[in-house]
Every structure is written in structure tokens, then in C-alpha cells.
Swiss-Prot record:
Part of the 30S ribosomal subunit. Forms a loose heterodimer with protein S19. Forms two bridges to the 50S subunit in the 70S ribosome. Located at the top of the head of the 30S subunit, it contacts several helices of the 16S rRNA. In the 70S ribosome it contacts the 23S rRNA (bridge B1a) and protein L5 of the 50S subunit (bridge B1b), connecting the 2 subunits; these bridges are implicated in subunit movement. Contacts the tRNAs in the A and P-sites. Signal peptide: none annotated. One of its GO terms (biological process) is translation. Belongs to the universal ribosomal protein uS13 family. Pfam families: Ribosomal_S13. The gene is rpsM. Keywords: Ribonucleoprotein, Ribosomal protein, RNA-binding, rRNA-binding, tRNA-binding. This is Small ribosomal subunit protein uS13. GO terms for cellular component: cytosol; small ribosomal subunit. InterPro entries: Rbsml_uS13_C, Ribosomal_uS13, Ribosomal_uS13-like_H2TH, Ribosomal_uS13_bac-type, Ribosomal_uS13_CS. NCBIfam families: uS13_bact. One of its GO terms (molecular function) is rRNA binding.
Length: 121
């Protein structure tokens, strides 16, 4: 099993699909990496030579992926929360950021329903 950027790439998949196992590499970026290195994107990972894998490692190393990308994303969200801007407040409250309605729906962001308080008669 090939290892690129600290991630095991599945052997039985094509190179383009296998590279998407790396956090921060999608289909389009995987194809660009394959084109830049000259590795055929429809070749299986198990059929790649050590030289091909080394080229892929070098090319993936030029892109922000895995832990660095996660850290950068987390820091961006933290920065918004520290600024106290609208998006930061919505992150802090766990509500949708981009203007979606919240009177109904938004369950993914808000979490499971909480029992309402019953009024005393």
C-alpha cells in the first residue's frame, strides 16, 4: 500500500481516485497532480513504480493537505470567533452561517431537537 502525505493510498483504485484519500485533495486537484507529474491517472496505484510514487509525493508536498489544512481551517474559524463578527457569532452558537432559515430546519447544524418547556396552567 502506497503512503503519500502520511496517508495509505488504496492499491486497487486508480491513481486519481486513490489520491482523494488525502484530506484536501479532490478529484480535480488529483487530476492536476497526475498531469503535472506525468503519471497516468487511470493507472492502478499498485502498478505505480517507486519513481512515480516519489513524483506524486513531491507534487502533493507542494499543496497544503492533511494536518496543516485542518489546522489552517480551524484557525480561520477561531479568528472569526475572536473578531466577534456575524459569522464568528454563528459559529460560536452552532447555527448556519450563510442566511439559511432557522425557524424550521437547520437540524444538522443545531443538533437533535430539545424538549420544549411546557407552560403551567
Amino acid at each position: 500500500m502506497a503512503r503519500i502525505a502520511g496517508v495509505n493510498i488504496p492499491n486497487h483504485k486508480h491513481t486519481e481516485i486513490g489520491l482523494t484519500a488525502i484530506y484536501g485533495v479532490g478529484r480535480s486537484r488529483a487530476r492536476k497532480i497526475c498531469e503535472a507529474t506525468g503519471v497516468p491517472f487511470d493507472k492502478k496505484v499498485k502498478d505505480l513504480t517507486d519513481a512515480d510514487l516519489e513524483k506524486l509525493r513531491d507534487e502533493v508536498g507542494k499543496v497544503t493537505v492533511e494536518g496543516d489544512l485542518r489546522r489552517e481551517t480551524t484557525m480561520n474559524i477561531k479568528r472569526l470567533m475572536d473578531l466577534g463578527c456575524y459569522r464568528g457569532m454563528r459559529h460560536r452558537k452552532g447555527l448556519p452561517l450563510r442566511g439559511q432559515r432557522t425557524r424550521t430546519n437547520a437540524r444538522t447544524r443545531k443538533g437533535p431537537r430539545k424538549a420544549g418547556v411546557a407552560l403551567k396552567k
